[in-house]
Amino acid sequence: MALFTREEALEYHRSPRHGKTEVVLTKRCESQKDLSLAYSPGVAEACKAIAEEQALVSEYTGRANLVAVISDGTAVLGLGNIGPYAAKPVMEGKGVLFKNFADVDVFDLCLKTGSTEEFIAAVKTMEPTFGGINLEDIKAPECFIIEETLKKEMGIPVFHDDQHGTAIISGAALLNACELTGRKIEDVTVVVVGAGAAGMACARFYCALGVKRGNIRMFDSKGLIHKKRSNLAEYKLEFAQEEDLGSLADCMKGTDLFLGLSTKNLVSQDMVRSMADKPVLFAMANPDPEISYEDAKAARPDCIMGTGRSDYPNQINNVSGFPYIFRCALDVEATEINEAMKIAAAEALAALAKEPVPAEVCSAYNVDSLEYGFDYIIPKPLDPRILTCITPAVAKAAMDTGVARKRIEDLDGYARELERRVKASHDRIRPFVASYE
């Protein structure tokens, strides 16, 4: 059952104030002295201090807690290339999630650029303003070029969430699915449908977790990716088979894991029936999965099924990752978000699923209980414990791999401080939002 109607969604974005975000002050501006401190002449003292020591920009401005969510609107959710104007509601929504879950401030920037080079050049000029860059909804292969170039040429974290967020959360789900079904990850066979940003990143990340590259068969809109196909995009060669191994139905036979990042109703019940014992399906087409939860379970009651939807078990949602990963990347002043940090996030999230679930989380999802098993392989996105689970693990990985410019010695204390920080943020925001109602 739908949680809302189309008109309710439009009204939510329209009223009582247009959009979902607003810039608010953190300092008073009510007296002559306030005004003089906020701007001229008092602001000059902060400017001079930063001019003498650039690192002080993190102390005297909000840069260290400010992330740019940047898109060109070429690959938006399940909507495709709708352009930068139509992409803006998504980018504002991303800002809401950053702030709500991890108290990270966001400016959303939808760019109207004519080329990959223009996009890269525009983002590079923003480094003095932001502590991190979240790339969003950019089509492949441009997204790979953009991220790789910006990571090399900027001194702040650059993270394409459509790639790595999906990979990290589904990677956590994969770790637990292997454990629950008695599989060794190095033996898992995988069929990936969707060779865009998310599909490629997931396949790469699964390899980092232990899946053998030769065990992955990848499909795009034209079928199996293999080296005898003509006009194959260069980036797809990474997972190309030597020969044409047949159709999706052929390749699904006996496979352990299906990963779908494509379109609805692509997978039949017969395909699911042909999979290995205790098959795992991550059907994440948006908004409707490649096969419904009901159809998959009817075909194979022994399957583990995950989707991107909140109304089915095992929701694989990027919001369980990116706010917290950026939170600690900012706090340790990381120069990048590297592979070790991503793996640490996935492992921490997987471990949390095995812990008893608080009543408040069960209540949020209208269930009596949640227990580690086939229908609960990954924590629910609204679980507040994710904050204190992921952030210390990722911070430690950043420090251990030498990308942190600032050390956090007491990680347990850091986790407790984050709890207080996010609660205080919620306490400030709640009456502010209510003032518009």
Regions found by a protein language model. Name each.
Residues 1-158, 396-405, 421-437:
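N-terminal ligand-binding/catalytic initiation module
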Residues 72-74, 82, 111-112, 137-140, ...:
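Short, ordered loop/turn segments at secondary-structure junctions
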Residues 134-137, 158-161, 257-312:
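ADP-ribose/adenylate-binding Rossmann-like module
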Residues 77, 82-102, 160, 164, ...:
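Glycine-rich phosphate/diphosphate-binding loop of Rossmann-like nucleotide-binding domains
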Residues 127, 185, 251-252, 272-275:
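A short, aliphatic-rich alpha-helical micro-motif
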Residues 28, 32, 39, 43, ...:
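Generic structural signal for well-ordered, non-membrane alpha-helical segments
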Residues 161-162, 181-183, 285-407:
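Adenosine-phosphate binding glycine-rich loop
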